[in-house]
Every structure is written in C-alpha cells, then in structure tokens.
Amino acid sequence: MIQTLPATIPASLFEQRADAIVEAARELSDLGWTPATSSNFSMRVDDAHAAITVSGKHKGRLGRDDIMLIDLAGNAVGTDARPSAETALHTQIYRRWPAMQAVLHTHSRTQSVASRLYAGGGVIRLQGWELQKAISGYHSHDSVLEIPVFPNTQHMPELVARVDAWLEAGKPLHAYLIDGHGIYTWGRDM
C-alpha cells in the first residue's frame, strides 16, 4: 500500500503509531481475540488524523503497510486503501474525547457470548470487582459499572447515534459491546 502523508505529519510519528497498532494486533491475535480479518485498531496521530488498520487484513499478520491514515471524518488520506467499515466508531471516540489516543475493537469468544447473553437487557452491570477501581471515575468495588450492549447493525450512523444517545443521557462510557459481535474500548495509550 502506498501512503502519502500530509506535510504536517512526520513519517516517524505515523510509523510509530503503525508499529504500536501492529504489535497490539499481533498480541491480541495470539490470544485468539481477533480471528482472521475481524477486529480493527487505531491510534490518534494528531488533532485531525488517526492511523487505522486497513480493511480485510488478518490482524495477526499485519505489517506497517497495513495501517493507513484517515481524517476524523473517516476519510482515507493519501492512499487508495479502504479502512474498516466501522471506522466511524473510532472517529466518534477521537472527536468526543481529545485525550483518547487509541481504540481497540476485538471479537473474543467471551465478549461475543456475553453480548448475546446480555443483549436483551441492553447492559452488563459489574459490581464487586476490585479492578473496577482502575477505571476512571470508579473509586470503589461497590460502584456499579455499566457496559452497554448495542444492537448490531451494518448501518454505522445508527450505531454512532446509539452511542451518542447513551452519552447524552449522562451515562459514563468506557467500553461497549455490539450484540453478537465484539467490544469497543479506548484509552490514553495503546
């Protein structure tokens, strides 16, 4: 794949992001969380761009050339490569939370089964887990952490709107599941 970068983005910065994505994708593939060409990963490059996995590539076999640049509207920048159909879910996070630097979407068996089991209620509620305190905004294992389970759709604007509605209702969001699909989560680094 040929990737031409805007003059404002140093090649070394893009390469660092691409290498971090490749490394994370391989580790998650080794765990069995990214079967074949499923899943997608991205990292913020600057205020207007992100590096993201190209569509249709086996995540355990990625190389630097399998990472492309997009703008935060989800458009390819400087390449004819095609990003994931779910790119809008990544860019939504970067636009909403400028401090977020990475988005991970995986398809582990556990996530997929949990999404099916809890889809009817629309949410998984976690309480009593000591590790909850490691999540921003949660100071006690007695707090209730909700992870929404959104209905699956191939119409990304609909899914983006569901995520927005959750947030506009004032609910905290650190991850979400898509029914029968997988999880999206994000953070300040890969």
Predicted feature residues:
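Glycine-rich flexible loops
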Residues: 1-190
